[in-house]
Regions:
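Carbohydrate-interacting/catalytic domains
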Residues: 1-248, 270-282, 550, 561-752, ...
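Hydrophobic residues within beta-strands of alpha/beta enzymes
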Residues: 50, 153, 289-291, 403-407, ...
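Short, flexible loop/turn elements at secondary-structure junctions
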Residues: 67, 147-149, 159, 173, ...
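Short catalytic/ligand-binding loop motif for oxyanion handling, primarily in non-cytosolic enzymes
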Residues: 201-203, 261-263, 297-300, 343-347, ...
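Substrate-binding/active-site clefts of carbohydrate-active enzymes
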Residues: 212-214, 228, 234-434
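Conserved alpha/beta catalytic core and glycan-binding cleft of carbohydrate-active enzymes
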Residues: 216-217, 221, 401-403, 421-575, ...
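Soluble or luminal CAZymes and related metallo-dependent hydrolases
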Residues: 269-273, 320, 384-389, 434-441, ...
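Non-transmembrane alpha-helical segments in soluble domains
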Residues: 278, 325, 393-397, 446, ...
Length: 820
């Protein structure tokens, strides 16, 4: 080896390159000025020879093999703004000319590091990842990745034979960002990051910021430029800014792309199914379509996201999805995406232990692992992680024009003890169970999305009653636009599952939601979680035979559409039979039309001024009635529902006098019902029912809901009606007076008759008493006579005996005397 060259070289540093142990190869490889020359060093393990061609000098310099591992070096005379290429010859004699990757300065600046480390680099996806570009007249790709715990990071791919010894990256900042520009790496090339830990472990990872991936589980990232199309939705994007989350209608059709695959030979690309989805959504009357995750995910596990920036390849290209959104917008359909910022799967081909240590997830498993599923929770305490998530949200909103995101259950990240037993969770710094870092992340997310994208919606699922989810951040809330009303869904479906015979005992499940209905801006949601197979799932929840199930299905959908709250239904195109599907399509189309055109059903959804119970106490009858109102009293609607399982004729109180017209009845024959309707204009009757002065007589099928529009009388009609009412009142008064006179006359006659009867009775009573007295006297006389007669006889009898005795004594004495 040339002695001068030998002395210039730093052999310990060369070993760092050969063994791929360093994090700053640029300080060794490439051209470095030494005195009046350049020391050019390169590492190509599989090369037989390497030469340097200097563009400035139009001269080639043969490089010496400094180490048999493939380390080459050469001395090149100094020249201003040196430009050079390597000419590499392999064992087969093939020559390849490449521009040295280590001849380029880094693109990331100190401001990027500061913003990223502070969690406020909201377009960091434009800096990290792979970005094809032209630098200094050279085409290639700029790579950057965040891996602070890595000892060495290399880019491997189609452009370097997937060799991790080549294209070793440099660490730019203590924050842990590695970068390199690789000439010749082009669009559609596959790549990965090869990471070596300080313990010597080497493994591969896909790019977290890749916008395209391929291979099983998306393990191969793909280089591509930012995609775009000739957007034609400017009118929609302008109109979107006017959306009022308090007063505007919102009817969401949730779909899974895979559900439409059977109609297209199993293809799930947006290119094939856009027209089908558009027709399906419009025919059912929805104004919004919500897609289950379209990001790269674990097969058959939509919410296990592997690459947050990449569209799942089964759904087609980025342009296909953009055209889908553009088409929907031009037809007046809003597009929402399901988005999962609350967890990610524990998988070696995703974000898990990305740089050899916990990076995107919490280090402590008491915080970082979901107990029930084993999924990993993002480390919201790392600003780089929250920056990743917020920039991802903005990426889909700004690049793909989507109109909003629906996040997965935030309760699982807001509460440190969610699904955890005592001792299995770690309290926050204040000893509480709130995840203060997750709380701050959610506020930062909603603030930044709304700040730059007015009209874009953020909807969330929250199941643990965290307060003020939809209140503004300024007022202490989380800043979401809407929250799923899971309590209503649970209670209502529980009520509807019961046989009508037993619903009376569950009436509170039907009415309880109105107690808390206005504490948040709610979306009433029949989601994929409850229905699984769309309306087929709801159909089989209902009691009874097929006819009764369909009637209860119509009733359930109708009730949801008239209850306060925005609407959300998970739909699958082939879930019901053809006949059932036609009926439900007709009904949902009509319900959505009423919902969107009748202000009473959405204008005051966030205020209790828009709802008034008429009768919520008829538990035994399984019936309810209420009024929906708007700022215009003429827009008032009356809703009556019969859930008893038997037909009923009822009287229902109404808040105002006027004419009422049935604008919807779920039992209409065109919806598959029996046709028991209330036809014509129904004039309110002045009769108190349900505490109201006026009422209607109605008839309802066994399981049916009816909606009545209200038309107040005109001034002329009111005058005529007032005159008629006065006449009616006058007649009523006359009838009352006559009735009272009749009652008085009847009372007098009754009194006369009573007096007459009384006199007769008293006379008869006196005669009876006299007869009784006479009879008694006679009986007494007879008794006394009898007693006297008996005594007299007895006395006479005694007297006769005494005389006989006396006469006998006198005779005896005379005789005795004569003897003397």
């Amino acid at each position: 080896m040339n002695g001068k060259l030998y002395k210039m070289m730093n052999w310990p540093e060369i070993e760092e390159i050969i063994y791929s142990d360093g994090d700053n190869p640029h300080r060794i490889l490439g051209a470095h000025k030494v005195g009046s020359n350049y020391l050019v060093q390169a590492f190509y393990p599989d090369a037989v020879s390497v030469s340097v061609y200097v563009d400035n000098q139009k001269k080639t310099y043969e490089m010496e093999l400094a180490d048999e591992a493939g380390f080459y070096a050469a001395i090149v005379p100094y020249v201003e703004k040196l430009k050079y290429k390597f000419i590499i010859k392999d064992v087969d004699g093939n020559e390849t000319t490449i521009v040295d990757p280590y001849s380029f300065e880094p693109l990331l600046e100190r401001e990027d590091f500061i913003k990223f480390g502070s969690g406020i680099h909201y377009h960091i996806y434009e800096k990290l990842g792979a970005h094809p570009m032209r630098r200094g007249g050279v085409n290639g790709t700029q790579f950057a990745v965040w891996a602070p715990s890595a000892a060495r990071v290399s880019v491997i791919g189609d452009f370097n034979n997937w060799d991790g010894r080549l294209c070793q990256m440099r660490r730019l900042d203590p924050i842990g960002i590695f970068e390199i520009f690789i000439p010749g790496a082009k669009e559609n090339d596959g790549y990965q990051f090869e990471i070596k830990t300080r313990s010597g472990l080497v493994f591969k990872r896909p790019d977290p910021y890749a916008t395209e991936s391929k291979g099983e589980n998306g393990i191969i990232s793909v280089i591509n430029k930012p995609r775009s199309i000739a957007w034609t939705d400017q009118k929609w994007m302008t109109q979107r800014r006017k959306f009022d989350k308090d007063t505007s209608s919102l009817s969401i059709c949730e779909i899974s792309i895979e559900a439409f695959a059977d109609r297209h030979n199993g293809k799930t690309g947006f290119k094939e199914i856009t027209a089908d989805i558009l027709e399906y959504v419009k025919n059912h009357g929805f104004d919004t379509v919500e897609l289950m995750p379209v990001m790269k995910h674990v097969p058959e596990h939509f919410y296990h996201i592997l690459n947050f920036f990449a569209l799942d390849e089964s759904n087609g290209t980025a342009e296909d999805f953009m055209n889908f959104v553009n088409t929907m917008h031009n037809e007046g359909i809003r597009v929402l995406l399901d988005w999962v910022p609350t967890f990610f799967p524990k998988a070696s081909f995703g974000l898990s232990d990305f740089d050899g240590k916990t990076l995107y997830e919490y280090e402590d498993p008491r915080v970082g692992i979901r107990p029930m599923s084993g999924d990993l929770i993002f480390d919201y305490g790392r600003k780089e992680v929250t920056n990743f998530l917020i920039s991802n949200a903005l990426f889909w909103i700004e690049n793909y024009h989507v109109d909003g995101l629906r996040t997965s259950d935030i309760s699982r990240i807001l509460y440190l003890d969610y699904d955890r037993k005592p001792g299995e969770w770690m309290p926050n710094i204040y000893g509480g169970n709130e995840n203060l870092e997750a709380l701050e992340f959610l506020k930062q997310l909603t603030e930044n999305v709304h700040k730059n994208n007015p009209g874009v919606l953020l909807i969330t699922k929250e199941t643990a009653c965290w307060p003020q989810v939809t209140d503004s951040v300024e007022n202490g809330g989380l800043g979401f636009d809407y929250k799923w009303n899971n309590g209503w869904t649970r209670d209502f479906l529980s009520y509807m599952r019961n046989d009508p015979l037993f619903r009376a005992g569950h009436h509170d499940e039907l009415t309880f939601s109105m107690i808390y209905c206005y504490t948040e801006r709610f979306v009433l949601a029949f989601t994929h979680e409850e229905l699984e197979k769309g309306l087929e799932g709801l159909y089989y929840m209902m009691p009874g035979d097929s006819y009764q199930k369909l009637a209860n299905l119509r009733l359930a959908l109708s009730y949801m559409m008239v209850h306060p709250g925005r609407k959300h239904i998970y739909m699958e195109p082939d879930a019901l039979t053809i006949d059932q599907a036609v009926y439900i399509e007709n009904m949902l189309g009509k319900l959505n039309e009423i919902y969107k055109t009748k202000a009473a059903l959405h204008e005051a959804d966030s205020s209790n001024d828009g709802f008034e119970w008429i009768n919520n106490m008829a538990a035994d009858e399984c019936m309810i009635s209420f009024a929906r109102k708007s700022s215009d009293e003429k827009e008032m609607l009356i809703v009556v529902a019969n859930m008893a399982g038997i037909e009923r004729e009822i009287e229902v109180g109404v808040p105002a006098d006027g004419r009422y017209t049935e604008v919807f009845n779920s039992d209409d024959v065109c919806y598959g019902g029996s046709g028991l309707l209330n036809e014509g204009k129904l004039a309110a009757t002045r009769k108190e029912v349900d505490g109201r002065d006026y009422s209607l007589k109605l008839k309802l099928a066994a399981a049916a809901l009816a909606i009545f529009s209200y038309v107040p009388y005109s001034e002329q009609e009111k005058k005529i009606r007032a005159i008629k009412e006065e006449e009616e009142i006058k007649k009523e008064e006359e009838r009352r007076v006559k009735l009272e006179a009749l009652k008085e006359k009847q009372s007098e006659e009754e009194q006369k008759l009573l007096n007459k009867l009384k006199l007769k009775y008293e006379k008869e009573l006196a005669e009876q008493e006299r007869a009784i007295e006479e009879k008694y006297e006679k009986i007494e006389e007879e008794r006394i006579f009898d007693i006297v007669s008996k005594e007299a006889i007895k006395s006479i009898s005694s007297s006769g005996k005494a005389k006989t005795k006396t006469k006998s004594g006198k005779t005896s004495g005379t005789a005795r005397g004569k003897k003397k």
